[in-house]
Amino acid sequence: MNLQGRTVLVLGLGETGLSMAKWLFRRGALVRAADTRNEPPAMRAFNSLLPQAEVFTGSLAGRAFYGVDLIAISPGLPLSEPLVQQALKEGIPVVGDMELFACAVGGTGGGMPKLVGITGSNGKTTVTAMTGAMLKKAGWDVEVAGNIGPAVLDALMRREDTGKMPQAWVLELSSFQLETTKSLGLDAAAVLNVSEDHLDRYAGMQEYAAAKARIFLGDSEGVQILNGDDPVVRQMTLAGRPHVTFSLATPQSADDFGLLREGGDTWLMQGDTRLMDARELAITGRHNCANALAALALCRALAVPFEPLLQALREFRGLPHRVEKVAAFSGITFYDDSKGTNVGATVAALKGLGQPVVLIAGGDGKAQNFSPLAAPIGEHGRAVVLIGRDAEKIAVAINECGVPLHRAQTMEEAVRKSFQLAREGDAVLMSPACASFDMFDNYVHRAEAFVAAVRSMQAARAGGNSAGVAGRH
């Protein structure tokens, strides 16, 4: 893609938008920017980089689009934006950072670097980090980027500056990024699962799943890695393309990955081959077995030997805010799953802990259907404490779950009530199944509030303010 002298409008001045502006400027484009926010987070950095460039803030204005040859859109802005739709009708290309990256790295020749991509409603950040760690353990020079951070173009520019490209790019891809990506041509691409999420942006599940399936676009004979337990994902199989499945059931073919349960043991398998005992994984839960199997399938698609991959899995400790153990006291264990921002993530967390749970949930529900929470709460739940804007919607959806439902106005109150409701041997799990923006800056801020409340309670108990767990029930 020749950008020299072309007028490009960057839509959105966050981390991704700024990375696109820097990349486009480096390629000789004439850059201007627009953002619906009055004070975009990267505004100062953009003005420092391009002090003469036009910047339009507030509601999008038609004059920002006048005379542009290309639009580089940030993932947070939907293609349904009327002025973007008008530009598309006029034949103006609209791309995102991943498409700019694809055009830059395509045609490098020699089969390197390898391109690996991961998407899914849940688990994609963990599988991306896990895959990167496994390839590094095998001695590969790897760059992990995308939705996980850093922005892929920032990583690419840093590699350009060093004069050394990696052997593999491992990319986390959101559905928002995939909407504007068509040329990646990945050597190995995984769709981990598809469950309700972002239905405030998509017309329905079919449109959302179609965005996820775009990971397989591009001139590629790369391997499809598909969740064999997810019927929506299985339908993404492309005729004539090599594909491998991963599953929590026994593998159905020699190439597929799955689990074998034998006596009290669970084995990670490929075909009939036992790879490792699931108890050797440093991260717990059935969902993390699935994550490990997906990462193995991705790495094996690049013909990496098993030994370093399995060793990396034994060492991988997981990521913050993903069913992360925060504390244990008075016989109760507290888990932070603030990254569980949709129903599917919370269902996986409930099923994965293997102990009775007092669940803290709620927030901005993103137009999801919460009824799938009812069955796992009924099976694993001790009680539910609901917070946030959509607490009542969740309460209505799970009303028949068979466990007590409580309300809290703050995270501190939710933690206090959860502790009172829990029994010895239980877990208190903060897995909201919702976005955080109704009460918090982001999911990290929400996690910090939860951890602070837990630590405060722990300190109070240690200081002698202890009635004993048994005495509370």
From Swiss-Prot:
Compartment list: Cytoplasm
Keyword Protein biosynthesis among UniProt keywords: no
Organismal lineage: Bacteria, Pseudomonadati, Pseudomonadota, Betaproteobacteria, Nitrosomonadales
Binding residues annotated for ATP, in chain numbering: G120, S121, N122, G123, K124, T125, T126
Recorded family membership: Belongs to the MurCDEF family.
InterPro entries (alphabetical): Mur-like_cat_sf (IPR036565), Mur_ligase_C (IPR004101), Mur_ligase_C_dom_sf (IPR036615), Mur_ligase_cen (IPR013221), MurD (IPR005762)
Substrates-to-products reaction catalysed: UDP-N-acetyl-alpha-D-muramoyl-L-alanine + D-glutamate + ATP = UDP-N-acetyl-alpha-D-muramoyl-L-alanyl-D-glutamate + ADP + phosphate + H(+)
Keyword entries, A-Z: ATP-binding, Cell cycle, Cell division, Cell shape, Cell wall biogenesis/degradation, Cytoplasm, Ligase, Nucleotide-binding, Peptidoglycan synthesis
Pathway: Cell wall biogenesis; peptidoglycan biosynthesis
Name recorded for this polypeptide: UDP-N-acetylmuramoylalanine--D-glutamate ligase
GO biological process assignments: cell division; cell wall organization; peptidoglycan biosynthetic process; regulation of cell shape
EC number, UniProt record: 6.3.2.9
Class of this enzyme: ligase
Source organism per UniProt: Nitrosospira multiformis (strain ATCC 25196 / NCIMB 11849 / C 71)
Function: Cell wall formation. Catalyzes the addition of glutamate to the nucleotide precursor UDP-N-acetylmuramoyl-L-alanine (UMA).
The keyword Cell wall biogenesis/degradation belongs to this UniProt entry's keyword annotation: yes
Entry GO CC: cytoplasm
Main location: cytoplasm
Signal sequence range: none
GO molecular function, one term: ATP binding
Top-level lineage group: Bacteria
Pfam short name (any one): Mur_ligase_M
